[in-house]
Amino acid sequence: MEGSDLLTAGVMFLFAAVAAVPLASRLGIGAVLGYLLAGIAIGPWGLGFISDVDEILHFSELGVVFLMFIIGLELNPSKLWQLRRSIFGVGAAQVMLSAVVLAGLLMLTDFSWQAAVIGGIGLAMSSTAMALQLMREKGMNRSESGQLGFSVLLFQDLAVIPALALVPLLAGSADEHFDWIKVGMKVLAFAGMLIGGRYLLRPVFRFIADSGVREVFTAATLLLVLGSALFMDALGLSMALGTFIAGVLLAESEYRHELETAIDPFKGLLLGLFFISVGMSLNLGVLYTHLLWVAVSVIVLVAVKTLVLYLLARLYGIRSSERMQFAGVLSQGGEFAFVLFSTASSQRLFQGDQMSLLLVTVTLSMMTTPLLMKLVDKWLSRQLNGPEEEDEKPWVDDDKPQVIVVGFGRFGQVIGRLLMANKMRITVLERDISAVNLMRKYGYKVYYGDATQVELLRSAGAEAAESIVITCNEPEDTMKLVEICRQHFPHLHILARARGRVEAHELLQAGVTQFSRETFSSALELGRKTLVSLGMHPHQAQRAQLHFRRLDMRMLRELIPMHTDMVQISRAREARRELEEIFQREMQQERRQLDGWDEFE
């Protein structure tokens, strides 16, 4: 595709997305179905604006690659090990059972047994991109059904390797002598990637983070994702699997949230491109010619996979209200079918329009999933109105923070220690990489990143947290963060550090009433001790401290609308005279009751 054609295609993709997705959302059919319909409209079987579908479809697979990297970031190796039973148990059972049933049904038509086997395996796979997108939209990520769904998708990615290796064997074109040397080299290369990633990625990102240039960090993240995808593709393995492994290797690093933030915009755009490309690939000519065959095939495919998945969910012990969600979200065909069926076609396993029929079936099955999930939602809403089963409780990984602490210098560390000592779940965001490395050694959950990025706050748990404590060194960052929280996370209770009186004024103007002036409190405490050292009774000095604090806060509030220096000086003189009168009355009262302690606010 030439440069001008590529630019034209880019403009058409953006126009289709901007026009179709908001319309689809307004109609209540979801963004994914909107992308698919937009692809049909601009593709060769629609208005014909774009004809080179295969090249664009291959490029758009990067959306799945970026998505799998982010999924890997959310899973550390220990959690992945905990999922081994569901990955190799339920995942393997789903692929084998679905493939056997679907292959048997294909053999009842004109498919040879070899073509039926490949067709059954390809149709047994689900769309990673669509399933994960729908699981996020439905809030399934932290549910048991969502975890099981991810396990099934992960096994399907692993099954790509033997499935592709099976094609030449079924076609009878496999080499007589198996090339063990070539296989050994691939295994060594894969092991080298794991070892290198395990010991090199953190030091490399630490070096890049020390530069303090955000654009370089983003470039390094893109290099990691695309490089690992290209490396796995060169080995003949799944690109998505490679980036997933890279994500897992960085899941426990302090850069996790910053990596998510850097990747997320690219992931969203490329996923949209992928769904548009799938819509463009729909061959309306084959659909029109074999309408009955395709319609029956789509219904049978969705029904078989839904039934298999539902039964496996029941055997696994998924609660009844989540089984249909789990089955429905994985009921479609997947993007891997395009790769597998193209490989099989090059080996002449399919005859006539067989490959086109299968691809049309896969594409239409993807379009049924958002509609099926809407039906499941309606069914669930009726089910949830009934009495709950006492033994069934929602499974939630309760690691969401109660408090987000922004900045972990000396001020923030004191707050963090107090919160952790009282068993509060906190997530800390810090831009000083040396502080991040130091605090992580002491068991703090500290992450490297710029907290003024909305997506970073969201991925750090701002939507679930109750409070945010802002201890930034720069007043500009503090005020920007307050504005972001007010706009995007209005439920958060904002507490902030004010370095001085000016910043305290700005916080009050922004509506933040819970703040602490770092020098004010410590200076006031030292002043109280000074009064005691000069002979004042301790409780009298305590009262003096309290009155001074109250009056100072009142002055702050009254001076907010006053901007001239003369007005502030005049008001400060009045406050000083008022404070002297208060102290005079207190001293007279204390002479009558020197040993009494008052309760004060």
UniProtKB/Swiss-Prot annotation:
Pfam families xref list: Na_H_Exchanger, TrkA_N
Domain RCK N-terminal residue range list: 400-519
GO terms, biological process: proton transmembrane transport
Keywords tagged on the record: Antiport, Cell inner membrane, Cell membrane, Ion transport, Membrane, Potassium, Potassium transport, Transmembrane, Transmembrane helix, Transport
Gene3D superfamilies, per database record: 1.20.1530.20, NAD(P)-binding Rossmann-like Domain (3.40.50.720)
Keyword Cell membrane among UniProt keywords: yes
Membrane topology term: Multi-pass membrane protein
Superkingdom in the source lineage: Bacteria
Locations listed in the record: Cell inner membrane
GO CC terms, sorted: plasma membrane
Major localization listed first in the record, in broad terms: membrane
Keyword Ion transport: yes
TM region(s), chain numbering: 4-24, 29-49, 55-75, 87-107, 115-135, 152-172, 177-197, 207-227, 230-250, 262-282, 284-304, 324-344, 356-376
GO function terms (MF aspect): glutathione-regulated potassium exporter activity
Family: Belongs to the monovalent cation:proton antiporter 2 (CPA2) transporter (TC 2.A.37) family. KefB subfamily.
Subunit structure: Interacts with the regulatory subunit KefG.
Family annotation (NCBIfam families): 2a37, PRK03659.1
Function: Pore-forming subunit of a potassium efflux system that confers protection against electrophiles. Catalyzes K(+)/H(+) antiport.
Protein name according to UniProt: Glutathione-regulated potassium-efflux system protein KefB
Species assigned in the record: Citrobacter koseri (strain ATCC BAA-895 / CDC 4225-83 / SGSC4696)
Lineage: Bacteria, Pseudomonadati, Pseudomonadota, Gammaproteobacteria, Enterobacterales
